[in-house]
Amino acid sequence: VYHVPNIHPTTVAPLLDHRRNVNTLYANGHGRMVAPPPRIDEKQDAESTRDVGARAEIATVGEIARTCIQSYGIFPNWVSQLTEFVLAPLLFWPNGIAKCRLECWTIAPDWGDGEGPDYWTVNNGERLCDILLEDTEFGTQIQRSMESPGFKGVPLSYQEARIYHWNQNADQMIGFDRIPAELAVRQVIGEDWVHTNDPRVNEMTEQ
């Protein structure tokens, strides 16, 4: 999420504090990110929900989704926001080398006779919303950088944990004997990081 201030300065940054995000890794490549809204002052946070036209609440949604930005990754190709108003999956379908089809969904309670909510597009699919336009344009630049002869890899940190966890599980599913060594990722995230385990909990207890 550290790309938010640079790529989404006016769209996402007002809703999300990228410095306070928490990753949860689940078995089989699934994951979740939770990030609170930015602090207005020592006692108050900003709002974390943007208006996408949804008015009927999902009554069973808990406190975290009502107060923070949540993003769930369901292996292998589902990423979705979850708020008290909508479930908004993005589905990624690889359809060639360096190509991918992006499918956008907005799932919400019955909105009656009015116009339905739309989390990812404008005018019922006329174009992508500004957030997705920013992401997709940024993704093209990342792909070009990775294909450059000068690209030798990047150091990874906690921020990329969910992505790396996904890649580890993709290799496990494909089979290590079917992947050229130079294309496989090192299996460095162990079970001690997979929910319900988390080494940081013990560290906090010890402190």
Regions inferred by a protein language model and the residue ranges of each:
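C-terminal catalytic domain of Rieske-type non-heme iron oxygenases
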Residues: V1-Q207
